[in-house]
Amino acid sequence: MAESRAERKARRALIEAAEGSEEKKSSKKSKSSQDAKGKSAKGKAKAKRPGSRRNEDKASQTRSKHSHKDRVSSARKAVDPKSPCSIMKSCGGCTALNRPYKKQLTAKQAAMEELFASLCEREGIAVDPIRGMGVTLGDPGKYPAPRGFRHKAATPFAPGKEGAVRCGFFERGTHKIVAVPECPVEAPGARQILNGIAREAERLHIPAFNEDKHLGLLRYAVVRCGWRTDQVMVTLVTAQRDLPHAQEFFEAVAALDPRIVTVAQNINGRPGNAILGEETRIVYGAKCMRDQLLGCEFDISPTAFYQTNPQQTELLYQLAIDGMDLHQGDVLMDAYCGSGTIGLCAVKDAQKKGIGIMLLGVERNPAGIA
């Protein structure tokens, strides 16, 4: 049943009220903390004798000690064992991982309703409930938080002390790397492969790339994990083609996980933050990995576009296909098609219904058409 405008406004008001309550509590805590600090500072100011050089020297030493302690404390606070992810506060990735999944979906629903408010009012329609992973907003019961759904993982590399190779995520708002032992939203094993690449590069004295000095070799690594096939493809991005102990390095990377079917090397010697360069070559295994969506099998090359969350991709594609309302003889153009996933899935769906259509795929990157 379509939700009325009044009902939508009422629900949005409840959401805003709940969020406002949380902000108010946070504001009160912050104010209380500031008041306490202010009283403490006044007390210290009274205790200090005017004109005492000794007190000033001691205060300077104390500030220096506290400054060092604060830096150490700040580094420790970056790791929160109670969070779903121990490095969530410092990592530049997830921002809502510690919120209950139902609240995440509710926030998305409110955002979509606000975005399409004028259209819905003009056309007399409503935004459908958000369809999450394994649950639709409004369903009764629990909303289990999804984990391990990102089937593409990547890392930058940076030089550490004494030839160390550092990897992980960029700290929020910086280019400082935060080490990542594991990531709860990535496919199982993906982060272990990336960390293993850093260890093997360090063992074989392959230097990490320094983006400030533009020196070094190993820049990035990308791991793509199949959803239905359980195959894994690794792409190593280097500043130049030639590497010390290259073959040994490639074979060591391939041995990190028995699921790895392809190791590719991409050469990117250009300055800047773009991950991939124009040249890619296969250095181990097959030229492509394989995965399946909606019953269609796809060959995926190292530089081809492929959706990161296959489970939601199937849901998204099926919604789009159902909305196409295809008929016999229709021509379907899949623009910027990458591997052609949505177009080919639409053709297969039409064939199941006995409908014959023509598919045209348009893609600029030849490697995308595996």
Locate predicted features.
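Short edge beta-strands and adjacent turn/loop segments
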Residues: 215-228
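Short beta-strand elements
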Residues: 148-171, 223-225, 281-282, 287-293, ...
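Short, aliphatic-rich beta-strand segments
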Residues: 158, 223, 230-239, 297-301
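Extended interfacial segments that mediate partner engagement and assembly in macromolecular machines
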Residues: 78-81, 89-208, 228, 243
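Nucleotide donor/acceptor-binding cores
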Residues: 151, 230-232, 329-330
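Generic structural signal for well-ordered alpha-helical scaffold segments
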Residues: 198, 202-205, 222, 321-325
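Rossmann-like S-adenosyl-L-methionine
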Residues: 3-30, 35-38, 42-75, 244-370
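N-terminal cysteine/histidine-rich coordination modules
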Residues: 2, 71, 82-88
